[in-house]
Structures are given as C-alpha cells and as structure tokens.
From Swiss-Prot:
Main localization (coarse): membrane
Gene: psaB
UniProt name for this protein: Photosystem I P700 chlorophyll a apoprotein A2
Catalytic activity: reduced [plastocyanin] + hnu + oxidized [2Fe-2S]-[ferredoxin] = oxidized [plastocyanin] + reduced [2Fe-2S]-[ferredoxin]
Organism for this UniProt entry: Prochlorococcus marinus (strain MIT 9301)
Assembly: The PsaA/B heterodimer binds the P700 divinyl chlorophyll special pair and subsequent electron acceptors. PSI consists of a core antenna complex that captures photons, and an electron transfer chain that converts photonic excitation into a charge separation. The cyanobacterial PSI reaction center is composed of one copy each of PsaA,B,C,D,E,F,I,J,K,L,M and X, and forms trimeric complexes.
Length: 742
C-alpha cells in the first residue's frame, strides 16, 4: 500500500479527513516534529537545506542571465544606458490580440516584451559585462553551480559525509569560518573583480579571460603594496569629466576615498566601492582569527559572555543587574530558533538599509535615472525586510516555547527581560497611543480646516531636530551652521585637511532627488510620525507575543500548549488571540500597514521631485485628502485606464494585475471574518450536492472534507491579504512611475 502524505508523520498520515493535507503542509518544514527525529538528524537536515537554498538562488540568477541574453537588449543598453529601456524577456500569450501585441512591442523589440525594472542591466553593466556572450557564459556557470550545490546537499545526507553534532555545536570555529572565509574572502575576491575587470571596463579597457593575466590593473603593479606605499593606489582618480565606459577623463587610481557620485553615471565611484570592499574584507579576515580554533588559540565565546557582568569589584552597580550573560552561550548554541531569530533580525535591518541606500547612495551606473526601477527596488527591499523582521520575532517566540531553560538562565539578562515584560509592553503601548492620537489628530485637524477653506489654519510643524541632523552632515539650506554645515567647525576643518578632492558635500547639497539628504518640512514631520506609529505598534504586538509565549496571568501553562494552539473558548476567560502564533499573525497586518506608509512616502516624495513639482508633496502631504487625492487617486488614474472600451496600452498588464490584486486581497476577508461552523456547513452542503449530481458524483474523496481550523483559516486569509497587497502595490508603483517616465 502506498504511503499517504505526510510520510514524515505516520500518525497524521492515518487521519481520515482533509486535516491530513493541511497539517502535513504546515509541518513539512518543522523538522523537529517529524517521526524519528534526533537532534543530530535535525542539524544534518537543516545543513543540507542550505545547499538546496543556494541552488535555488543560483538557478534564479542563471534564469535571469539566460533570458536577458536570449530575449533582451543588453548590448543596445550598453551603448546608451540612459535611453534604451531594458527588456526582461519576450511574452508569448495566446490571449493577446493585435492591440495588446502592438502595445507591448516596445524598446526596439520585434514582438511583445516585458520591460525590466529589476536593475539587473545596470548591475551587470557596472561590474564590467558588455556582451550577450558574457551573459550566456555566466548563465552556464550559475547553472553548473546550482547542480554542484544540489549535489553537495545530497552528499551531506549520506552516512559517510554527515557532519557530527559536535561539529555543528562548535560555535567558535563556525564563526571564524563565516567571518574570515565567507565574508572576508568573498569581499576581497569581489574587490579583485572590481579592480581587475569592472574598473578597467569603466575606463574603456576590456579585460577578459584572454588578457586578464597580462593587463596590470594599476601601472605600478604590486610594488606599492609590498613597499607599504599604499597611497599610490589612490593617486590620479577619474576626473569629474570622465565619460563612463571610455578612456576620456579616466585616471589610474584603484582605491579612492572621493565620496559623492560620479557626475555622469550618477553612481558611487567604482574606485570608492573597491576601497570599501578591500577594507571590509580585511576587517572580516582579522575578525575570523579572533575566536578559539581547534588548536585552542583565540577567545572563547563562553568566557567573553560570562565576563560581561557587573560582579567586578570596581563595578559601581555591584551585581544589581543579576548575573548578566551567564548561561547565554549555552542557550544560544543549543537553540536553532534563537540563532535563526538573530540571523533574521540582522538580515532584516540590513535589507531595510539596502532599500534606503539604493536610492540615497546608488552604486550602479545610470540606475538613478531609471525612476521606475528605483521605486520598484525600494519597495521590494522594504517588503522583504518586513517579512524577515516578523520572522525574527516568530522564531524568538518559538525559542521561548521550545528551547528556553529557566534553570540555565536564572537571573541573567534573558530572565530579567522576561521578568520586566509588563514594564516593556506597557511603555510600548503608551508610545503607540501617544503617536497614534497625536499624528492622526493633526492629520484630521488639517483635513477639516482645508475642507472648510482655511488651509492657513493647519498645524504645520517644522522637523527642526531632523533638519539639525541634516545640517550637521553638511546640509547648508537650513542655516544652522552646525558641524559640517559650518565651514569653520572642527569637523569641516578636519574634512578639508584630507588630501585630494572629496565630493560628499556636493552630494548632500545637490538640488535634485539624488541629494543624500532631501529637504524636509511639515509633511515629512507628519508622515515620519505615522511611520513611527506603525513601527512601534508592529513591534509592540511582536514583542508581546514573544515575551508572553511561555505564560501569562490568564494562561500560566501556555508553554505546554505549544507555539500555535487553538482558541479554547470562554472557559478560561477567553483565549482566542493568545498563542504566540496569533500575535505574529496580527502583527503581519500592522507590518503591511506600516509598509504602505513607508513606501507611499518614499514614492510620492520622489515622484514630486522627479517631476519638478516638489510643492505637490509639501502642500498636499499635510492632510489626509491630499494623500488620497494627489497621490493615490491621481497616480491610479493611468493604471485604471490601462484598458478600456477604446483599446489598450502597455500599462494594461499592470492594470489587470492591479485589479486582480484587489480581488486576491478581498478574498482574504472571506477566511478572516467567517466563523468555522459556517465553513463546515458549507462544505457538507457542497459535498452532499456533489454526490447527488450526475457525472460530478463520479469524483469522490478519499478524505472526508472538513472545515479549516481557526488557525488554518487565519493563515489562508493572511496569505491572500498579503499577496493581494503586494500585487496591488507592485502594479501601482511600476505603472504610475513608468507611465510618467517610461
């Protein structure tokens, strides 16, 4: 007899109802809950999945390279990167009529194509790629890499090649390896590519497999390196008149500290980027030699954490903070969920910073003038950062349920955080209410006075503290004369004493959207506080969910119920929204709400600057109807007209996605609001009708159909809500921006 799904849980496989399928999918990746799972097997399985993950990434990159080389216009883009619209891939669709075929035949293509808003063309151009042949070669390499990593994943599951549990628990060696080899060496290797390939190409000199061993990346070769005359590598940088990709105005420097942007490509200087990578690679290689290796050389993490205490005789606190980090080393090293939570939080912060800096400090040549790509990449990275951050708190909560040992952590910082959770949660609650009432109150007040014809009665607050911070970095327009905006300050004198030319002040004081600090006023002040409200509310729900994971006054035995337990009904005073899973589920809605405010703000402010109409954001951004009318409605107009009775245009696929996204989003409410009993009755009715209908009654079920549990329905509803949100906003951002700028 064939084994029924899920094979990893034979108890669940015997379930005669459709619950079997749902619970099987839900626990497929929860290796801890699988039959016959040991701690060693768990680590080995997870280790192998990392190789699978790498294979998927390599395959995705290979697919992009292959389709752009095959169906794109990369070589035409290289000749004129500011005017040629990059093609992602061709479209073959049996639903296309002549109108849409004509509308989608664009960017010099002979048939219907999609325009690329991923920034891949700019990335590949910046790193020195110039021909379709190079893209094909890279695609083949990435495909081979995908096969190799898949093989590595399979190999490490074979008995002879399975690492032992002790190998996985050797935190210091793993840290050394990740710091020195993965981060350090890869950063230095990337410097090598930039210096040997990308920088020469940016100066009109091709370096390929045929000549890379004979072309010196710097006229002096390695002599300055060995004679410690490293400054030689910074001399003779590219001039301000350099034409990117040609020898005109090119210098010979490879590691510089120029600051600001290349005037023509409007991206960071490639020589600055190379300097950054060699510096960070060196730091990481040094860091990768700090922790205790198998020869007993280096620091012990356990000793470091346990030395972080207030028990030292000279410490003024004299142990008043408990025993600090005692027990933390074992707690982290023995909990995969703790480690994953830390990794997700770190990556989440980094991804959000990437979103900001791709706009404020663009590193790819000419990408700053591709407004649609910039808008899409900002939204994309902020959305990903949000998912990663919510995941960090989710696994933090699972840690408290599954892995936390109260005895091991007695009176240390973890225990202290749990012990003071009421204070933490109530303070966060107070902050969210303060932000919410005041921000909404000012928006609503402004709305009313504008509606009644008295816009001069709006409450408009200048963000003076933020303006001061900008001035301290060198923004002159506010007249603060602080630090770098004061030519006579110690900061300015120190900056001016650096040898050579530096351009960060030019970048900060630019008059366009590429200024590192855009001018800010009352509209920014209000939306900043709205975003702060979203951040604090999301954090409140997530932190409360994690800190209450083990127990509350209402449910002191919560840790015994697991991470996601169903509603108990009114028996214990009502426990419907009390599992940690429910907190993460509720936080997702606030996180998506917050993302809307963050991305709306960035997008509208930039649209206004790009269109030369800064006053639109500054004047309409101070009241709610301004946001609804002059941002959402005004920018949806072209989108809603993507197709109409008179024909279609190239925005019509985005218009359709906008409509479809709303449908998916609204479908979510069907699962989020309905009661479980209604679904069970509906299913029973449908099954009854099915069984009594000719032809339809030939199809039967092996499993008895049962309604989704409350937790399952919430998940399905949230999935629809989230995907609908992404489809709707993605289509809106791309269509509203490309409709204006191409």
């Amino acid at each position: 007899m064939a084994t029924k799904f899920p094979s990893f849980n034979q108890g669940l496989a015997q379930d005669p109802t459709t619950r079997r399928i749902w619970y099987g999918i839900a626990t497929a990746h929860d290796f801890e809950s699988h039959d016959g799972m040991t701690e060693e097997k768990l680590y080995q399985k997870l280790f192998s999945t990392h190789f699978g993950h790498l294979a998927i990434i390599a395959l995705w990159v290979a697919g992009n390279l292959f389709h752009i080389a095959w169906q794109g216009n990369f070589e035409q883009f290289v000749l004129d990167p500011t005017h040629v619209r990059p093609i992602a891939h061709a479209i073959w669709d049996p639903h296309f009529g002549s109108g849409i075929t004509e509308a989608m035949t664009q960017a010099g293509a002979s048939g219907p194509v999609n325009i690329a808003y991923s920034g891949l063309y700019h990335w590949w151009y910046t790193i020195g790629m110039r021909t379709n042949e190079q893209l094909f070669q890279a695609s083949i390499f990435m495909s081979i890499l995908a096969c190799w990593t898949l093989f590595a994943g399979w190999l490490h599951l074979q008995p002879k090649f399975r690492p032992s549990l002790a190998w996985f628990k050797n935190a210091e060696s793993r840290l050394n390896h990740h710091l020195a080899v993965l981060f350090g060496f890869s950063s230095i290797a990337w410097t090598g590519h930039l210096v040997h390939v990308a920088i020469p190409e940016s100066r009109g000199q091709h370096v390929g497999w045929d000549n890379w061993l004979t072309v010196l990346p710097h006229p002096a070769g390695l002599a300055p390196f060995f004679t410690l005359n490293w400054g030689a590598y910074a001399q003779n940088p590219d001039s301000l008149d350099q034409v990117f990709g040609t020898a005109e105005g090119a210098g010979t420097a490879i590691f510089t500290f120029l600051g600001g942007l290349h005037p023509q490509s409007e991206a960071l200087w490639l020589t600055d980027i190379a300097h950054h990578h060699i510096a960070i690679g060196t730091v990481f290689v040094i860091a990768g030699h700090m922790y205790r290796n198998t020869f007993g050389i280096g620091h012990s993490l356990k000793e470091i954490t346990e030395a972080h205490n207030t028990r030292h005789p000279n410490d003024p606190h004299k142990g008043s903070f408990g025993i600090n980090h005692d027990g933390i080393y074992e707690t982290v090293n023995n909990s995969l969920h703790f480690q994953l939570g830390l990794a997700l939080a770190s990556l989440g912060v980094a991804t959000s910073l990437v979103a900001q800096h791709m706009g404020a400090l663009p590193s790819y040549a000419f990408i700053a003038r591709d407004y649609t790509t910039q808008s899409a990449l900002y939204s994309h990275h902020q959305y990903i950062a949000m998912f990663l951050m919510v995941g960090a708190f989710a696994h933090g909560a699972i840690f408290f349920v599954r892995d936390y040992d109260p005895e091991l952590n007695k009176d240390n910082v973890l225990a202290r955080v749990l012990g003071t959770k009421e204070a933490l949660i109530s303070h966060l609650s107070w902050v969210t209410m303060l932000l919410g009432f005041h921000t909404l109150g000012i928006y609503v007040h402004n709305d009313v006075v504008v509606a009644f014809g008295n816009p001069e009665k709006q409450i408009l607050i200048e963000p003076v503290f933020a303006q001061f911070v900008q001035a301290a970095q060198g923004k002159m327009m506010y007249g603060f004369n602080a630090l770098l905006s004061d030519p006579t300050s110690s900061a300015s004198l120190a900056a001016n004493s650096l040898p050579g030319n530096h351009y960060w002040m030019d970048l900060i004081n630019r008059q366009d959207a590429l200024s590192a600090f855009l001018p800010i006023g009352p509209a920014d002040f209000l939306v900043h506080h709205a975003i702060a409200l979203g951040l604090h509310t999301t954090a409140l729900i997530l932190i409360k969910g994690a800190l209450d994971a083990r127990g509350t006054k209402l449910i002191p035995d919560k840790k015994d119920l697991g991470y996601a337990f169903p509603c108990d009904g009114p028996g214990r005073g009502g426990t419907c929204d009390s599992s940690s899973w429910d907190a993460m589920y509720l936080a997702m809605f606030w996180a998506l709400n917050l993302l809307a405010w963050v991305t709306f703000y960035w997008h509208w402010k930039h649209l206004a600057i790009w269109q030369g109409n800064v006053a639109q954001f500054n004047e309409s951004g101070t009241y709610l109807m301004g946001w609804f009318r002059d941002y959402l409605w005004l920018n949806s107009a072209q989108l809603i007209n993507g197709y109409n009775p008179f024909g279609v245009n190239s925005l019509s696929p985005w218009a359709w996605m906008f409509l479809f996204g709303h449908l998916v989003w609204a479908t979510g409410f069907m699962f989020l609001i309905s009661w479980r009993g209604y679904w069970q009755e509906l299913i029973e009715t449908l099954v009854w009708a099915h069984q009594r209908t000719p032809i339809a009654n030939l199809v039967g079920w092996r499993d008895k159909p049962v309604a989704l549990s409350i937790v399952q329905a919430r998940l399905v509803g949230l999935a629809h809500f989230t995907i609908g949100n992404i489809l709707t906003f993605g289509a809106f951002v791309i269509a509203s921006t490309s409709g204006k700028f191409g």
